[in-house]
Amino acid sequence: MIISVEELKQFITTDKADLVLEVRLQALEQLIRKYTNNRFHQKPYVRIKANVIAGNFVTDDVIPFKVDDTIQVSIGADATDCGIYTIKNVDGQTFTVKEDVPDMANATVTKVSYGNDVKMGVINLMEWDLNNRHKVGVQSETLSRHSVTYFNMDGDNSLMGYPKSLLGFLKPYMKARF
């Protein structure tokens, strides 16, 4: 994940369940990766070859990952993407991930690393999501002499369900699509 639920709670106060926040963070990670067309592989590449047997990654290499690192698993000569996973446990020559993973032979496991600007951008998106998502579609509210006008989320003002101004941090990470 880009940021853990514990890290998020240091910046945002919310009464949402940890599982709900984790799912939203995973959805934001997928959204950002698809939108930017960027895999965010750590440079220089930190990768190993491993076999996946009954959910355990087994390798002869030194494991360069630690608990809660994000990894991308790919397979084959064309590096077919098999998904992104979060490290759950590292033990000697094996490690496990939090998500279910199918058995595969000779998989390439690459560490995914996000910069602090991406982490802060995700925090801002989550804060907007928690505080303003329910107001989308409401232009204004008036009660007696008190009137409140909300940000307009139509047409050119929004992108992927978020205000464009909150997504500016992704511009340096955009990669061309061919």
Question: Positions of the model-derived regions?
Answer:
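Conserved short "hinge" loops at termini or chain/domain junctions
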Residues: 1-120, 133, 156-178
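Short Cys/His-centered divalent metal-binding micro-motifs
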Residues: 126
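Contiguous, low-complexity intrinsically disordered segments that are highly enriched
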Residues: 136-155
